[in-house]
Amino acid sequence: MKKLSFLLALLMTASLCRAQEELPVLSADRPGNTWGAEVLAFQKVSWENGFNFESAPDGTHSLTLNSTIVRYGIFKNMELRVGTDFMLLNNGRTPEHSLAVGPLTIGTKLKVYESTNWLPSIGLLAEFKSPHIGSKEQLPSHIAPSMYALFEHSITDWFGVSYNAGLVWDGETATPQTFLALALGFSITERLGTFIETYNYLHPDGNQYMTEFGLTWMVTRRLQLDLECDLDFQQFGKYYAIGGGVAWMIN
């Protein structure tokens, strides 16, 4: 599961920001698969960690024990990102599980425009997966880049919209997948929020249409907890993923 930024955090912490305007508030890159345009504040460090259980139609399943991303604000409008996954895999035919480490992912996000009136905030995200660092069976044959345009609207103080468009290479072929995502975020209270999103991978060999929904709890301005569930309505009842996690702005 990809780790995502979500404008829901901004909605839920708007009053906190007004009360403490000099203090930055965490805008987490999880949960969800739709990134927002916000970046981490200058010289701030965040650690985001989650778990995820995924069951596929072919009987295989995986448990992501630790899906980690570390973010660092290198400039006012730019952040550096490093992440990987630690997983238990099962082929669905035997009870044995194997431990695997996903490829190291390195990237950067740039905020290029701050929302004005009905115009959205705009960001750019570029990442690549290393073919050298991680478990051998999880590594791509070549560097696997991805790039995204990120858009984010705060419609009201309790409702927001994020949407993305991007290209994703798998490191095996020269033909990328097209990534399209749309997320709706709602503030239930000042600290509790919910979201629903659709995220889709389009490829000549076949498309994948996914839906995710979940809850977020902004414990403090620097700490967020979340729960989420993914469904594939093309294979309803055969595929699902459930997970949760924490995002923490360390300094």
What are the language-model segments listed below?
Residues S15-A19:
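Sec/Tat signal peptide C-region and signal peptidase I cleavage site
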Residues Q20-N251:
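Transmembrane beta-barrel domains of Gram-negative outer membranes and organellar outer membranes
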Residues L4-T13:
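Sec-dependent N-terminal signal peptides
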